[in-house]
Amino acid sequence: MRLAEFDRVPPAVPTDPDAVSRRTAEFVVDLVETVAGQYSGPDMRSRKVALPVAPVPAPSTTASPMPGPRSNIRLDEPALVTLDTIRAAAEVIRGVVVRTPLLPFGRPENGDPLGRTRAWLKPESLQPIGAFKLRGAYYNIATLSAECRAAGVVAHSSGNHAQGVARAARLLGVRAVIVMPSNAPRIKVERVREDGAEIVFVGPSSEERAERAAELARIDGLSLVGPYDDAATITGQGTVGLEIVEQLAALDERQSAVPSGGRTELAPFTVLVPVGGGGIASGVAVAVKSLRADAVVVGVEPALAADARDSLAQGRIVTWPADMVGRTIADGQRTTHIGRIPFALLRRYLDGIVTVTEDEIVRAMVRASREARLMLEPSGATTLAAWLFHEDELPASGRVVSILSGGNVDPVRYDELLARGVAAGG
């Protein structure tokens, strides 16, 4: 993979549980935090950045520090997101969240008698709410104390996290208040209402949503369920990566004709994960790299909202104006800046970022519909776009798994986007 290199010092992450507890107590912060750095102007010509990966420690054999039940104090420390906590989250969400399949995409490679394909899809669009967000939302709320659940929760989201929190809260019998932007897709607003959540509308920027949610949490005593800058939410999203590694291992075992109970070496692989605020990207990166240090994890952003690329390239959180990120059709990735916790984790675990154009996104939506019979929203198609149109920027060998984050799109809007994709060369 041809990635431009730059110097970066991975953040120190304590491994001792007692040290983690002390650091957590010391670093509990306000619900809204001023983002480090100022807008410095996106370089739209840059396609990707290289992220040096620190050595990945062996999986811990001690109990994880992620407590449960939790108070409504936020768990901000990146050290709380570990393979152990992600495995624990997988047990908590079992039976609520779908273990989405790995689907082969495209034709088998020539001359392969086993019919193996290089590209695989992880369609989180098949979740009960049509997106991966139920994972983090359910785990977050389920591990709150009974007292906190009785008081209720508040969240801010452009759509899919809102649906995840609304559904999780309904399943757990918890009051939910959701702060949404005035330009949120209608279909997502309707589904949040259907699950019984109260909706508060604000302006289009993520800062406005975060500030209003923090205000409601303070006034009404609600627990904030963060969309991405929240260790519990990130941990829940990381279960996607855990499943990918397990499913690829099972696939290799079957294709190698290894008897049940036998062992086979997992072939090299790459995971493409969308980056918005960084919740799923950081959770998946932690899970995958903790299990397979030789795996490659690449983030994918719209070129019109590539703040994470700039942040990781510059070694500080860079903010893009709301009117700039608002240009992309990928509404789930219109965050103006990456979260503080995801930033720390991605600096340590992510291998690189690829950006995709608007035409590439809609063309990927067309290909998903035609070849995989999957209905994807624009944000759900960015990783497939990276595979289809930027394969030369990825490792030359091994399987490539694209995480398709969601499929919540208004039918009329979906038809318009497909028509645009066909016109662009679909």
What is each residue range found by the language model?
Residues L3, P14, A19, R23-S40:
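Polybasic, low-complexity intrinsically disordered segments
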Residues R2, R23, R45-R47, S60-S64:
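Low-acidity, Ser/Thr- and Arg-rich intrinsically disordered low-complexity segments
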